[in-house]
């Protein structure tokens, strides 16, 4: 049987949730609604392209009309995994269920872990808090250069980052330190998603992070749909953070991006390239620049900017292209704290030749992975239900 679509373009709007999940209370996220809160703060969101696709049919959003005949099929997805971080959400999208969440460290890392790291590296540690990579260099860069102590910090995601000046801690030593940290943080009580080497150069007031960053991620805890696509000789193109999130597993081509705008540019380039398979884009700015920083205005403006770019992309899609737009968790910028929020995520599925239908409430993000596998006739993941047959021709 011939595959339905030659190419599937999957866009994850990182952290763009659409209302509290049924288990939000267990995560301390009652009342969270990323899109709803932003729409209220703006007294109405102006997103004509998402509106035309059917965003207003998924949930009531101030300023977004519930159009009678949307261009896309639409629904809502609930996360089945026990976590609300980027890796968990993305791994589930490609067919895995995570039963033990990755740890986050809003108050810094435990003393025992740092003592082990000090003992194994012979270097002191400074920082040990949630911080932006540039701000912590301004704060501690000079002390690091004087003492040789490692700058250790984290974010709202499950990461342990180690910054060091390349003339103080040679690159090979920094990489060796990060490998030691990676081994230590595999322990269940720590279970960190990623360890990141963050080398920098320069002098006080003029610090500059170099391109020698290196990520020590965890490989997915099982095979994903991306692996099965690669095995079948199909494309599995990773744009933005996607390759890092899956530690390169099942990736046939990786393209780095510098921003949401750059991500959409890179997506447009792939649309104009001939391939058969999946092109998977993560737009991280929503989460990293606005959600965690609780910048509701910046977040709303970024959504409206994305909407405009979406309007440019849609006419470029061919008859055999399928576009899926979704998210990996929430991050309500009006919610308490700075962490992600446990929410439903939107699901919009567009092809110019299919009749729009209500895809309903999906019980797992893995329904996307199952649909991708179903379309390309590769092995389906053990989790998820394909909605391919629900996408009927006009």
Swiss-Prot record:
Protein localization: Cytoplasm
Binding site for Mn(2+) 1: 14, 328-329
Single biological process term from Gene Ontology: 5-phosphoribose 1-diphosphate biosynthetic process
Cofactor(s) the protein requires to work: Mn(2+)
Details of cofactor binding: Binds 2 manganese ions.
Annotated positions binding Mn(2+) 2: 287, 292, 340
InterPro entries to which the protein is assigned, alphabetical: Alkaline_phosphatase_core_sf (IPR017850), DeoB (IPR010045), Metalloenzyme (IPR006124), Phosphopentomutase_DeoB_cap_sf (IPR024052)
Enzyme class: isomerase
GO molecular function terms listed in the Swiss-Prot or TrEMBL record: magnesium ion binding; manganese ion binding; phosphopentomutase activity
Pathway stated in the Swiss-Prot or TrEMBL entry: Carbohydrate degradation; 2-deoxy-D-ribose 1-phosphate degradation; D-glyceraldehyde 3-phosphate and acetaldehyde from 2-deoxy-alpha-D-ribose 1-phosphate: step 1/2
Tagged with keyword Manganese: yes
PANTHER family, per the entry: PHOSPHOPENTOMUTASE
Family membership: Belongs to the phosphopentomutase family.
Cross-referenced HAMAP family: Phosphopentomut (MF_00740)
Function, in words: Isomerase that catalyzes the conversion of deoxy-ribose 1-phosphate (dRib-1-P) and ribose 1-phosphate (Rib-1-P) to deoxy-ribose 5-phosphate (dRib-5-P) and ribose 5-phosphate (Rib-5-P), respectively.
Protein name: Phosphopentomutase
């Amino acid at each position: 049987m011939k595959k339905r679509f030659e190419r599937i373009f999957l866009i994850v709007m990182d952290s763009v949730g659409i209302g509290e999940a049924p288990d939000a209370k267990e995560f301390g996220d009652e009342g969270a609604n990323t899109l709803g809160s932003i729409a209220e703060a703006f007294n109405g969101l102006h997103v004509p392209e998402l509106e035309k696709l059917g965003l207003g049919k998924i949930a009531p959003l101030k300023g977004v009309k519930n159009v009678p005949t949307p261009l896309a099929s639409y629904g809502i997805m609930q996360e089945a995994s026990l976590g609300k971080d980027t890796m968990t959400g993305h791994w589930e999208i490609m067919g895995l269920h995570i039963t033990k969440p990755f740890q986050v460290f809003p108050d810094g890392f435990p003393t025992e872990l740092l003592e082990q790291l000090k003992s194994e590296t012979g270097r002191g540690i400074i920082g040990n808090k949630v911080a932006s990579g540039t701000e912590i260099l301004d704060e501690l860069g000079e002390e690091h250069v004087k003492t040789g102590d490692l700058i250790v910090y984290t974010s709202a995601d499950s990461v342990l980052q180690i910054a060091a000046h390349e003339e103080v801690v040679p690159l090979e030593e920094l990489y060796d330190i990060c490998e030691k940290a990676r081994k230590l943080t595999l322990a269940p009580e720590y279970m960190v998603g990623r360890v990141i080497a963050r080398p920098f150069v320069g002098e006080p007031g003029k610090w500059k992070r170099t391109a020698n960053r290196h990520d020590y991620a965890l490989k997915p805890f099982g095979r994903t749909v991306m692996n099965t696509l690669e095995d079948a000789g199909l494309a599995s193109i990773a744009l933005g953070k996607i390759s890092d999130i899956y530690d390169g597993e099942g990736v046939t081509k990786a393209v780095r991006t510098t921003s949401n705008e750059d991500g959409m540019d890179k997506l447009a380039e792939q649309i104009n390239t001939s391939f058969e398979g999946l092109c998977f884009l993560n737009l991280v700015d929503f989460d990293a620049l606005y959600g965690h920083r609780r910048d509701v205005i910046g977040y709303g403006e970024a959504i409206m900017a994305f909407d405009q770019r979406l309007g440019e992309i849609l006419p470029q899609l061919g008859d055999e292209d399928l576009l899926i737009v979704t998210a990996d968790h929430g991050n309500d910028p009006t919610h308490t704290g700075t962490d992600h929020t446990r929410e439903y995520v939107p699901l919009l599925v567009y092809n110019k030749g299919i009749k729009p239908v209500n895809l309903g409430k999906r019980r797992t993000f893995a329904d996307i992975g199952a649909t991708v596998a179903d379309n390309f006739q590769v092995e389906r993941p053990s989790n998820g239900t394909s909605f391919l047959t629900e996408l009927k021709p006009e």
